[in-house]
Each structure stands twice: as structure tokens, then as C-alpha cells.
């Protein structure tokens, strides 16, 4: 299963990155690069994410702490992010 990231501008200065598939390995680096390049207010939509690894969770936790909104996050990922943030 691959990872797909679709960028959608939803108004002036607001962008949603819709992530689907497997967010692990090289795909985490791809998402990291996209997040670093973005100058708009960001929302990550994780509705269609099926699998993440530890690096993905760390990335999500850091960016959520820095103001990126995470929508439609599967419960197991949400819990993992919460635990990661507690350890930061």
C-alpha cells in the first residue's frame, strides 16, 4: 500500500493535506518536506490513513504542537500521538 497526499487550498491562506494509505518509511520524509514547504495555515486530514510508524507519529505530534490541525484521525493514531506528546 502506498501513501498519497493531496493538497487542497480551501480559502485564502488555508490548505488541507489529505493523506491516505501507509504513512511510514520514505513516505514520512515526503510528508515532512511538504509540511516544511507550506506557508499557509495547515490541516492534515488523516481519514484514509491505514498504517503509521513511530517516525510518522513523532512528525504528527511535533507539527500538531506547532499549530497544525489534525482532522479525522483514527483513534489508535490519536492515542499514539497523545502518548508521544506527553513524552516531549
Language-model region placement:
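Amphipathic alpha-helical interaction surfaces in cytosolic regulatory modules
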Residues: 19-88
